């Protein structure tokens, strides 16, 4: 979220996708993510187009968010039976980016849950680059090797253009 805010402060149009059911990125951006709003959940399950979920941050007119809602917590179970489940977010973003509002976006940042399920796989398939923000402590570093292995698997099978930034 801090990187998104900094980019927007320097004049870039930034979209944050809050793919974490806890919704902390939405909260940090001042976006309501309670109740019956259209959210990234609706995009992932295929009931809403991505552009319809975007909310402008009150902090900066160049900063937008596709918020999380509690519905996202059940999305992993719903995705299991869906066709092309790993590509749902990617396909929605491709449609958005080829439209006039999407063409104006400079950066899309996806905030992922701290798990390696289908929501995170959707993010990796949709992304061009992965950045792993972690604290330099033992428990935080413990899961990085598994995360890097999963990124390599996604790169090998689903998104060959995916890079891991340093």
Per-region residue spans from a language model:
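P-loop NTP-binding core
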Residues: 1-166
């Amino acid at each position: 979220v801090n990187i998104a805010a900094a980019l927007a402060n320097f004049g870039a149009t930034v979209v944050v996708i809050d793919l974490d059911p806890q919704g902390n990125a939405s909260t940090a951006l001042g976006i309501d993510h309670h109740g019956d709003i259209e959210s990234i959940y609706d995009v992932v399950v295929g009931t809403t187009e991505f552009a319809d979920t975007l909310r402008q941050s009150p902090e900066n007119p160049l900063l937008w968010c596709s918020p999380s809602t509690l519905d996202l917590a059940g999305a992993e179970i719903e995705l299991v039976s869906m066709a092309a489940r790993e590509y749902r977010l990617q396909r929605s973003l491709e449609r958005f980016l080829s439209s006039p509002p999407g063409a104006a976006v400079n950066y899309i940042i996806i905030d992922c849950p701290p798990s390696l399920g289908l929501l995170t796989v959707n993010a990796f398939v949709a992304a061009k680059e992965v950045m792993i923000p972690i604290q330099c402590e033992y428990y935080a570093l413990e899961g990085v090797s598994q995360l890097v292995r999963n990124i390599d698997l996604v790169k090998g099978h689903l998104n060959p253009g995916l890079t891991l930034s340093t």
